[in-house]
């Protein structure tokens, strides 16, 4: 079986979801007995299991992975990893809820892998520095899927963004959003920067470019993944090669595209 998500990146994702779902455990590693070590009650365990069941499509198909029969975080992670690397299952995400209640979105893995492989070819990245939450599709694709493929990924929270110039290697892609870019003042020249989730100010991109930082804005959504990108020095967006415009509609090609 081809590895889609490796153990190291899985740990990052599981902890992110754990802290987001069980706020009292923020900063506590997901390990040990769920009750005696992590202090979870039955409702918290049910909430957390439901979250992982959805995000890894664990209860669908011929192979079901029902987490509530296991009492330790290690066994949960063992079966989450199996589901993550089962090509017949999907990855689940929640929309931001900006237009109402957050919606559940499930993506076939081969489509996310298609996007991962495009970005690796496009950026020529050797590693990733991720400044965005990995539970959202943007951070998941760039931080976890690219990171698992490249075997080189670093993850910085908001209180660590100032370290980016210290941890980024020359061939790393730095994945952020406008808020992160506004707060990063130290130069990190000759890196490739990615921005998404919201429009980025032109003056800010000009400032970053003056420090020899190349970058692009990525346009997309939880429902679609990335659709188009815009180089910081350009005015217009360019469709990713597997998106095809037909009239006023966009259709995604499954295969047979070239960069």
Tell me what each language-model feature is:
Residues 81-94, 124-127, 213:
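Conserved pre-ATP/AMP-binding loop-to-beta segment of ANL
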Residues 92-104, 222-223:
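Conserved adenylation A10 loop of the ANL superfamily
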Residues 1-91:
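Phosphopantetheine-dependent thiolation modules in NRPS/PKS and related acyl-activating systems
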Residues 185-235, 245:
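Gly/Ser/Thr-rich phosphate-binding loop
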Residues 52, 95-98, 128, 140, ...:
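Conserved S/T- and glycine-rich ATP-binding loop of Class I adenylate-forming
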Residues 239, 248-259:
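Conserved ATP/PPi-binding loop(s) of AMP-dependent carboxylate-activating enzymes
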Residues 106-117, 127-184, 216:
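AMP-binding/adenylate-forming
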Residues 31-32, 124-128, 190:
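Phosphate-coordination loops involved in phosphoryl transfer and adenosine-cofactor binding
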